[in-house]
Amino acid sequence: VKLPPAVWDWSGGYIGGHVGGGYGRTSFSNPYGPSIYGNVVDTPVFLAGGQIGYNWQKNGWVFGVELDASGAVSDGTNTCLAASGFVVSANCKAGPNIFASGTGRIGYAFGALGHTLAYLKGGVAWQNNRGDVVNNFEGGSPQEKAHFDYGRLGATIGLGVEQALTPAWSVKVEYDYLHFGGPSVATPPTVQNPPFAILPANTTGLSSNYHIGKIGLNYHFGADPWTAQWSDAPLYAKAPAGAPIAYTAGWSFEGGSRLWLSRGRFQWDHSAVDAGGLEDPSILISRLTYHGLDGLSGELFGRLDSPWGVFLKGNIGLGRFHKGNMNDEDWGLPPYVNTISGQTNGRFTYYTTDAGYDFLRGANYKLGGFIGWTYYEQSSDTTGCVQIANPMATCLSPGDDRVVGSQNTQWNALRVGLSAETMLTERWRLSTDVAYLPWTDFKGRDNHLLREETTFDEQRGNGGGGVQVEGVLSYFITKNFSLGIGGRYWAMWTKRRGDSLCSSSGCIGAPPIFAKYSMERWGTFLQASYRFD
């Protein structure tokens, strides 16, 4: 007599690894009073690390504890300590390089013989955060700088889904929120004018929070790691109404379209130091920040799978935006100027293309690594110009919305990442991608149209890094047709020693200036796709 297959038990120890990425913010308090602008540094982050844990299962409920640690790559800058247009404010830089956490988990096993675990988690977390507080250009006065590098305990909560692939291996997709209060760190003395005065060194309080998506792979102790499939186990606990949705062993192509509702950001840090100089390029004379760039794009995507586990995938999209703001900050004489302008005629295009290999795959899952390329281009016109910081520096009157400038940006980057797909139930599928961008190349052009002579800045940068994270939950209406909802976060940045070169007739012979560039775009999309087996 053939016995029915046993329900999977999650009890026992495990060890594994993970990659992840997402969005962070570090906030700086202002010891000089309420800030006109800034004080929050966006810190996109990519992380990779490992975890070890233990589960106890009682009926369908699963309880567990887990320790994890990650190394992180992150970068972000913004204005801080901008209490007045008569005080030289600072350029604040922040970025974590290590995360660790100890959490408890509670979840419920459902689906095919208990192979799918949905869980909540919470506990303590630790980060190491480091950065600088650098006075911007002080008009010839000695430049001051303060550095910080600290560890801090905080808290984390999260949720996730873990799928048992074989008796030895499981893959998880997880969202974590982390929050850290911060210490007080030193700020350098700065200059006020008028009346001229040296404001003494002070302190600023820091706090940080992060939204992180992860893909993890766990090995469960006591099982044969080379067992590729479950022994004689049906995919679903009851007979499905139709043919089950599962991955074919032969050639397969899935393609479709998406609508992506997203928000974008672009930042240009313009150093006060000539390219090639020995001074700190973090000392700024100007910064332009384009933010709130809300847009809608249409997109085509596809994935081709071979019988040998090799796959090709990619997407291409085109979008527009007609809202957003640009803050143009300058330091020198006067000490601080900040104008705000609108955005119109916004356009963005993008594509990604990857080749990879599924090193774990079965009838209802695939997990693989990939290498590829990504491209992103954005253009917009800037309208209006209203001064918000210093009454000694005026711009246009409120309501005068003439076009005063434009910006074009083009990004290319190498992608290296992990892709995971698993059928949670008969018709629900979860798909995720996490990619690290180890190298970026940036080219842009800025047009200033409000000056007596129109000026053009040719912008270049490379090195740096980036992160791209995506997740989709799909429902198969038929065996081949599905609808889905997903989320996506993209960020790229260059090294501080990129440059910008004024190329108009009014600045012939001017040297290249150090510059740093960064971008973000994130949002939610809806998709429809069809699979050909």
Predicted feature descriptions by range:
Residues V1-N325, I340-D533:
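Gram-negative outer-membrane beta-barrel domains
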Residues W331-V337:
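A charged helix-plus-loop insertion that forms the helical arch/lid used to bind
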